[in-house]
Amino acid sequence: DNIYFQATGGGVCFGGGEPTMNADFIIEFAKLIPKGWKLTLETSLKCSYKTIESLAPYVAEWIVDIKDTNKTIYEKYTGVSSEIIQQLCYIKELVQVDKVIVKVPHIPNFNTNEDVKHSIEILKGIGITHIKEITYMEHITHITK
């Protein structure tokens, strides 16, 4: 695998759920992988500043799903409060801004096109340069008898 990853610039991505909850494991894993492998974290940043700081030296790329910058929309969708803007500003102090990709989803029944545009403007205003506007895909379950 090492030859393949070295040749392609590949690596490992931790995502699903909230990977920052396993920060200690990710750090130990990062210490074991061959030099040159890219470690990516796909996260909602629902973690402490200390966790962000501990992961920063090991994570080559941060993919951050913000849901929405509007705190009311965020809380209605997730059920928890948000410090996402403050956390993104903190990450920018620790890593190069081009290593941070922020996903802004259109979430049916939670945010509007205007909400998404507003979130993108806020992100640009704090200096985020890699912004991906995405369409939220609801999982469809088919039950057969």
Predicted segment positions?
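Conserved AdoMet/S-adenosylmethionine-binding subsite of the radical SAM
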Residues: 2-139
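Binuclear metal-ion centers of metallo-dependent hydrolases, dominated by the metallo-beta-lactamase
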Residues: 143-145
